[in-house]
Amino acid sequence: MGSEQALSEVVESAKERFGRLRHLVQKFLDDDDVPQECLPLLQECAEIWSSYVDACQDITMQAPKEDANRLSKGFLRLNETAFLYYMIVYTLLEDTLPRLKEFSSNKDQNVRNLYGERIQLLHNDPNIERIRNVIENYPKFIQLQTIEPGKLSSMLHFHGDALLLIDVRPRSEFVRAHIKCKNIICIDPASFKDSFTDQQIESVSLITSPHSDITFFSNRDKFKFIILYTDTQLHNNFQQRQTRILAKILSQNSVIKPLSGTKILILENGFSNWVKLGGAYQSSVSETAHLTSSSSTPAFGSPQVPTGLFNQKSLSPNKDKSMPMVSMNTQPLLTTVQRPQLPLYYSDLPIIPQPSPNRNSPTVQKFSPHPPTTLSKLNTPSTIQNKANTVERISPDIRAAQAHAYLPPASNVFSPRIPPLPQQNLSSSRQTILNNSQVLDLDLIVGLENIGNCCYMNCILQCLVGTHDLVRMFLDNTYLNFINFDSSRGSKGLLAKNFAILVNNMHRHGAFTPPNVRTIPVQTIQFKKICGHINPMYSDSMQQDCQEFCQFLLDGLHEDLNQNGSKKHLKQLSDEEERMREKMSIRKASALEWERFLLTDFSAIIDLFQGQYASRLQCQVCEHTSTTYQTFSVLSVPVPRVKTCNILDCFREFTKCERLGVDEQWSCPKCLKKQPSTKQLKITRLPKKLIINLKRFDNQMNKNNVFVQYPYSLDLTPYWARDFNHEAIVNEDIPTRGQVPPFRYRLYGVACHSGSLYGGHYTSYVYKGPKKGWYFFDDSLYRPITFSTEFITPSAYVLFYERIF
């Protein structure tokens, strides 16, 4: 095997490329308000042609830097942009304008002359043919090359200054151990996607990286070789795929620094193989035994191995004789990286006694990324689906699991809880936590910088950071065990990791804060950039709805940690299955739907925040019903337009039976036509952490400012559906998963809104335990409340409750 191997990656063909560009031209013309008079249309052509000329000048300036055999994708995009401008003008002059009625009858010589000049410019343009050739001849395959470990070791020894190594693994793995090289950086594989350019790698992927990494990457064009490597034994498909994507970005998507003089290579077989063969690496002491224990006799790096990898051919044939064999110590050089011990966590909240385990008050189990044991005996997904879709009784073995369904944890419990699951060997950090006696404060008091109309984000962050079970998993790094790199629905850990960074910064500045000490506000700009990268809605400085941001953040964290995120969505129920489901009690049907939901959506976020409600339509003629089940992490309840109301009025409004208007009547599948019908919502699952949005804005964005009275202690048991016929039915064949009344809650956070949706301001109140009490947060400012019920406010918009017993 040679020192370099070509890896072909199929890219867009010339035919596909031209088809895509012509589609964009047509889309522009369809979307644009094209003038219907000759002179204005000619003027628009002149403006677009000016843009075309500018694009051609950019191409001319960039062309000398381009290798004809290795054009960058940035250069291709310049040519594509120019081609788009040309084709828009071409279509307008050759097709659109001659079709205008005014054109054939127009006697204005000035218009005729202008048209002739534009056509002449179009047909005599000297650039378009060259632009077409670049687009047509852009490589159909991108050649990625690999380098053998022996050759890399030799190059590091003799030409180390000419090499930049990029470790494409999570930073935690990089810190534990990486190839020994002074010019090395780490780019997390979850921090970029295939559409990125080198500029986005610098501005997004490296946003939280050390300054040295950013400096090395900004000087990447000064290195003769860039070597990428990952670990082929961990997250195999994802990390290898991301490494190849990064190589393509650097070779083809380099916009600000084309690497025409730099060769990009990928280390063959990754980091584990490098260590196994005796390559030099830097490691924390705690990882040394693990890395070396599985290594066989080094294949290179030892004088006793004359036939080792160092006898292979060099990257450059003419350098073979000038590169003598390198003798390397078989014991890698170690740089000790001390790991801080992870402490226990402290909360001012009083410890609430847990009920003793029994049928109605089950025990709490630890979180595990495996599917629920209540379905573990069903061996295949199809079997699971069939069981969940029918009324057939589930195996009696499942009944025993009912004793393990859990209730919300008391505040002295160490980790987020999830239903009873098979155990998996998790990170040793959990044991470190349990074995350490140090105590940390979870009631963080620190302000957040407002970097421009981001108060909607700050108020939600303050309330979520008041959720101890959520904060705990991001402080002790438990969340890292559950990032799903294979899921196509999340950001592959990008959002979760940056949320963890923010939480740790808030903890660093806001833990153990004395009442009379003012802390430095925490910067949120990096976290907001990541949010804007994932959802462009949050990329600018426009004001947004805080409850929508809360929904976005919880959904994003869930998808990053979703253990079943890579599974296909379940098929919809058949008509027969729906009919059978309608015959069930509401408790049984909703529990089955929840089990189906967990098969594709299973995370600690679901465990903490997710609830469920049923929506039932009923025909008033034949009484046929149809019930659907929806999950929620933020429950939006309507605010009645009255002078005064309390939150239970909102829940009554939410769950009342509504007679549908003529325009909204349900098309009854039994009557086979639209009939007078009703709709009713019932809450079928109440979560541990209940987030309630008071719907103050109507469809026209008019705000209802009525003062909604909400209590510190809230009992929602009457609004938890036992059954539509009010029968208390106990299901013995499916787990309760904590859905055992009563459902009593305690308020711990309030997000407030004053003003209009587009011109208002967001603040928050958060409970910091009995010693510190309630605090008011207004971006970077904070203070204790000035009177005991200040947090009960007319401006309340989103309420945060936690379940108690």
Curated annotation (Swiss-Prot):
A GO cellular component term found in this entry reads: cellular bud neck
Catalytic activity reported: Thiol-dependent hydrolysis of ester, thioester, amide, peptide and isopeptide bonds formed by the C-terminal Gly of ubiquitin (a 76-residue protein attached to proteins as an intracellular targeting signal)
Q: What InterPro entries does its record include? A: Papain-like_cys_pep_sf, Peptidase_C19_UCH, Rhodanese-like_dom, Rhodanese-like_dom_sf, Ub_carboxyl-term_hydrolase, USP_CS, USP_dom
Every USP domain range: 446-804
| GO aspect biological process, one term | protein deubiquitination
What molecular function does GO assign, one term? cysteine-type deubiquitinase activity
Listed A to Z, the keywords are:
Hydrolase, Protease, Thiol protease, Ubl conjugation pathway
Q: Which PROSITE patterns match?
A: RHODANESE_3 (PS50206), USP_1 (PS00972), USP_2 (PS00973), USP_3 (PS50235)
Record has Phosphoprotein as a keyword = no
Q: What is its EC number?
A: 3.4.19.12
For region Disordered, the annotated ranges are 359-380
User: What residue stretches are annotated with the Rhodanese domain?
Assistant: 159-283
The lineage's top-level taxon is Eukaryota
What positions does UniProt annotate as the active site of this protein? C455, H761
What enzyme category does the UniProt record give? hydrolase
Q: Which residues form the signal peptide?
A: none
Residues annotated as coiled-coil are: none
Family (UniProt): Belongs to the peptidase C19 family.
This chain belongs to the protein called Ubiquitin carboxyl-terminal hydrolase 5
Q: Organism source for this protein?
A: Saccharomyces cerevisiae (strain ATCC 204508 / S288c)
